[in-house]
UniProtKB/Swiss-Prot annotation:
Record's keyword annotation contains Amino-acid biosynthesis: no
Cofactor: Zn(2+)
Record-listed Zn(2+) binding positions: 24, 27, 40, 43
Keyword Cytoplasm on entry: no
Gene behind the chain: rpsZ
Protein name: Small ribosomal subunit protein uS14B
The organism's taxonomic lineage, starting at the top: Bacteria, Bacillati, Actinomycetota, Actinomycetes, Mycobacteriales
Family the UniProt entry places it in: Belongs to the universal ribosomal protein uS14 family. Zinc-binding uS14 subfamily.
Native source organism of the sequence: Mycobacteroides abscessus (strain ATCC 19977 / DSM 44196 / CCUG 20993 / CIP 104536 / JCM 13569 / NCTC 13031 / TMC 1543 / L948)
GO cellular component: cytoplasm; small ribosomal subunit
NCBIfam families: PRK08061.1
Length: 61
């Protein structure tokens, strides 16, 4: 889990637009965040396996 202070800091509007960055809406992780879902890769995978994300399914080729 991310530190609460860093999650709160990221939630505020930065003084300069380039300082903004994405965080996972579920756990607060700052890296590997899918913008479309607002989730990190770990949370995205867990929720997809649980069937909580409509339209997402495991692919194989």
């Amino acid at each position: 889990m991310a530190k609460k202070a860093l999650v709160n800091k990221a939630a505020k509007k930065p003084k300069f637009a380039v300082r903004a960055y994405t965080r996972c809406n579920r756990c607060g992780r700052p890296h590997a965040v899918f913008r479309k879902f607002g989730l990190c890769r770990i949370c995205l995978r867990e929720m997809a396996h649980a069937g909580e994300l409509p339209g997402i399914h495991k692919s194989s080729w």
